[in-house]
């Protein structure tokens, strides 16, 4: 028996060297096309970070109504939408404006997403462009046959009315995407309360970027126990809310400590008990044992329902000697609460305040004055492109 083990280890080393040379090959046969789309200011910031840290096998696309912000962003493709609506000055916090501007550019977006197999849509919920554009982009990608994953952040409670917009935007995105992963900005107050505001937001950008990078490279880079696009498709088609877990440890008790680290992720606020699907990928050094890898996968999926579909893989990298990293996506979380508890509470409070104010206006006899919007529509601004399959004038409303 010892001879068999020794021979297997010798063969393993030879196979690893052969695999290494194959990885350097330029043969891209069968590789899925992954596109990461950032909509609005927060989404663009994530795209900029992704572009700079690099994601193997994925294209980055930035979409915005704000020309100045878009100029500052680095991406493989940049699209300024709704130029005739906003003059490149942004959506003014109005999701309907962001939605309209993106619909007018759907021909261009279809071209960019044409043969994509997996599309990530990242945005900040609660503003104008991201909230309105993300569901439109998700719908276009879905109609063209791609698996669509939304990766979004929610506003601070102090932003009040924006939490209501965020809730509505999340519901719209959930209706169009296969799965959505939600991160709550309020958790930054607990995680990095004393960082300068710019650096605090960059932490959220980095977490979203690293998550998208991790998922993308899990299915584009070879592994010892491989995960591929078909596995991703199977898990993401479970639908509902998805929960992302990331953990890393150098502790001797890798099996439990890496799971503890993932469970205590500071920016995730959704309970995934009863989820119907799980995708787990483990990265470790040459010292990672089969028992440890299986133990990690088992521990991190124990909260899933008994009949959950779990797919796991493992990759060995020399730089991970003595440590281990786990990334898991739990899908099919059948929770009506997409926002975190604190954000949901603020959204409910803000909605009640808005409804009360509208009720008072109705009782006082005041009516909504739509003359300005009507005048805009009559002047033709709202008619160029419309909801046509392809916008009528690319040069007018889309700048790439």
From Swiss-Prot:
Q: Which CDD domains match?
A: FtsZ_type1
- Where is GTP annotated to bind? 41-45, 128-130, 159, 162, 205
Q: Where is this region: Disordered?
A: 1-30, 338-400
Localization (cell): Cytoplasm
Q: Which UniProt keywords apply?
A: Cell cycle, Cell division, Cytoplasm, GTP-binding, Nucleotide-binding, Septation
Q: Can you state the subunit structure given in the record?
A: Homodimer. Polymerizes to form a dynamic ring structure in a strictly GTP-dependent manner. Interacts directly with several other division proteins. Interacts with SepF.
Q: What is this protein called?
A: Cell division protein FtsZ 2
Organism of this sequence: Haloferax volcanii (strain ATCC 29605 / DSM 3757 / JCM 8879 / NBRC 14742 / NCIMB 2012 / VKM B-1768 / DS2)
């Amino acid at each position: 028996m010892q001879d068999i083990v020794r021979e297997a280890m010798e063969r393993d080393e030879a196979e690893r060297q052969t695999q290494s040379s194959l990885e350097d090959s330029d043969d891209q046969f069968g590789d899925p096309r992954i596109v990461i789309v950032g909509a609005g200011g927060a989404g663009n910031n994530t795209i900029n970070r992704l572009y700079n840290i690099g994601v193997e096998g994925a294209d980055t696309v930035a979409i915005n109504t704000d020309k100045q912000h878009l100029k500052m962003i680095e991406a493989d493709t940049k699209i300024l939408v709704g130029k005739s609506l906003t003059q490149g000055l942004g959506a003014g916090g109005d999701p309907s404006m962001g939605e309209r501007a993106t619909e007018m550019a759907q021909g261009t977006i279809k071209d960019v997403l044409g043969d994509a197999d997996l599309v990530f849509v990242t945005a900040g919920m609660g503003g104008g462009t991201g909230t309105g554009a993300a569901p439109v982009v998700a719908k276009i990608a879905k109609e063209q046959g791609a698996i669509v994953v939304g990766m979004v952040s929610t506003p601070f409670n102090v932003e009040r009315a924006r939490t209501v917009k965020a809730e509505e935007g999340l519901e719209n995105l959930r209706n169009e995407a296969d799965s959505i992963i939600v991160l709550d900005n309020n958790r930054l107050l607990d995680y990095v309360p004393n960082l300068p505001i710019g650096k605090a937001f960059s932490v959220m950008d980095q977490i979203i970027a690293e998550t998208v990078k991790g998922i993308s490279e899990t299915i584009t880079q070879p592994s010892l126990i491989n995960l591929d696009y078909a596995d991703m498709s199977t898990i993401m088609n479970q639908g509902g809310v998805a929960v992302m877990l990331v953990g890393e440890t150098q502790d001797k008790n890798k099996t439990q400590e890496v799971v503890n680290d993932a469970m205590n992720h500071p920016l995730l606020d959704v309970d995934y008990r009863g989820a119907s699907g799980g995708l787990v990928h483990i990265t470790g050094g040459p010292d990672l044992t089969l028992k440890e890898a299986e133990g990690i996968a088992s521990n991190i999926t124990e909260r899933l329902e008994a009949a959950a579909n779990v797919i796991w893989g493992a990759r060995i990298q020399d730089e991970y000697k003595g440590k281990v990293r786990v990334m898991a996506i739990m899908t099919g979380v059948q929770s009506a609460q997409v926002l975190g508890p604190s954000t949901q509470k603020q959204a409910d409070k803000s909605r009640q305040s808005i409804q009360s104010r509208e009720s008072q206006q109705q009782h006082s006899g005041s009516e909504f004055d739509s003359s300005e919007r009507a005048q805009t529509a009559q002047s033709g601004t709202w008619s160029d492109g419309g909801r046509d399959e392809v916008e009528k004038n690319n040069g007018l409303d889309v700048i790439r």
